[in-house]
A protein has these predicted regions:
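Conserved, non-catalytic sequence blocks in retroelement Pol enzymes and Pol-derived host proteins
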Residues: 36, 61, 129-131
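A short, Trp-centered hydrophobic/proline-enriched beta-strand micro-motif
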Residues: 116-125
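Intrinsic disorder at enzyme termini
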Residues: 1-11
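A short core secondary-structure module
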Residues: 150-192
Length: 195
């Protein structure tokens, strides 16, 4: 088996290294000191095509492999961990689940968000279950307008920034939640509407 990178992978890694060294390195300490979300870095990730790397070409992405994502992440993580994490969350996790299990309508709606710089989030951790998926108690039950989610999640990386969430629940079917529409809190505590 040949473990050498292809010419395209070497070029991708070089582009990521140049962006990291030429732009992100100078900003990293400032983002850490102020604990602010690095929106300027996200804009640069979008311009470089590093958001949604694994999104299929037919949906506007690069159709990149996980190895391609890791090459980009490795170069960026050398200088700015938070920006590297944004590449991970914008190319794996929710994006992979949506590509594998989402409807065409969901893909058309949500992939552009990621490609434009919206980093998705995964909501799995619960007060009593931690991140043990087998112990989750949050439920999603069918409701007149979609689903009603009952339960509590904690420690959601990007919860204050993300619009697209993959919420782990006990359910017979799957769906995606977006902040401000799907997943919007209702008047009942810990009850969310979803469709």
């Amino acid at each position: 088996m040949d473990f050498k990178l292809t010419a395209a992978q070497e070029a991708l890694r070089l582009r990521a290294r140049e962006l990291a060294d030429g732009t992100f390195r100078a900003r990293a300490a400032g983002w850490d000191a102020t604990e602010q979300y690095p929106w300027d870095n996200v804009k640069d990730l979008v311009r470089a095509g590093f958001m949604g790397l694994t999104i299929p070409r037919e949906h506007g992405g690069a159709g990149a492999s996980i190895l391609d994502v890791l090459l980009v992440v490795e170069e960026i993580a050398r200088v700015c961990g938070v920006t590297a994490r944004i590449v991970v969350e914008g190319s794996l996790g929710v994006v992979g689940a949506l590509a594998a299990y989402g409807s065409e309508a969901q893909k058309r709606r949500y992939f552009p968000w990621v490609l434009d710089g919206d980093k998705p989030a995964i909501a799995i951790t619960e007060p009593e279950a931690g991140s043990a998926a087998t112990d989750l108690v949050t439920r999603a039950d069918e409701a007149p307008e979609g689903y009603a989610i009952t339960g509590e999640k904690r420690w959601i990386t990007g919860a204050g920034t993300s619009r697209l969430y993959l919420v782990y629940c006990r359910i017979n079917r799957s769906f995606f939640c977006s902040r401000g529409g799907v997943g919007k809190p209702s008047s009942t505590p810990r009850l969310f509407r979803a469709s």
